[in-house]
């Protein structure tokens, strides 16, 4: 069964692309009785406030008609930022050679948090260089991952 994020991705992807943006990812978080639905959008040259407003209006209209969310919710639309979360293997592929931090669902070697240079991706396996050593992580075990920006 698809998650709410996957259902929303399928429902909203083409509409966001029609507005000239890429739907980078979706996060749904419960806070009390409300659900926060957070859409991250990106585009060549960066996202403007107007882009976020346009996407928010379009997505709100779609969600009002399709009604895929049973709970009360707040919609947020923003850029993924410099420390952007990575949602898909294609996104990881774009950041090979970059430093990332990964949080796992199930610990590997008694650790849930790994930070290192993303070396390569083969099938559903990511190889990080952590303290000079290769560490292989399974994509399906990743709960969350973010780019560590360079300044």
From Swiss-Prot:
| Major subcellular location class | cytoplasm
Q: CDD domains given for it?
A: YlxS_C
- A GO cellular-component term linked to this record: cytosol
Keyword ATP-binding attributed = no
Under the heading Pfam families, the entry gives: DUF150_C (PF17384), RimP_N (PF02576)
Q: Which UniProt keywords apply?
A: Cytoplasm, Ribosome biogenesis
Report any one BP term from Gene Ontology: ribosomal small subunit assembly
Q: Where in the cell is the protein located?
A: Cytoplasm
Q: Which family does it belong to?
A: Belongs to the RimP family.
PANTHER family reported for this sequence: RIBOSOME MATURATION FACTOR RIMP (PTHR33867:SF1)
Function text: Required for maturation of 30S ribosomal subunits.
Q: Write down what this protein is called.
A: Ribosome maturation factor RimP
Q: Which organism is it from?
A: Pasteurella multocida (strain Pm70)
Upper classification of the organism: Bacteria, Pseudomonadati, Pseudomonadota, Gammaproteobacteria, Pasteurellales
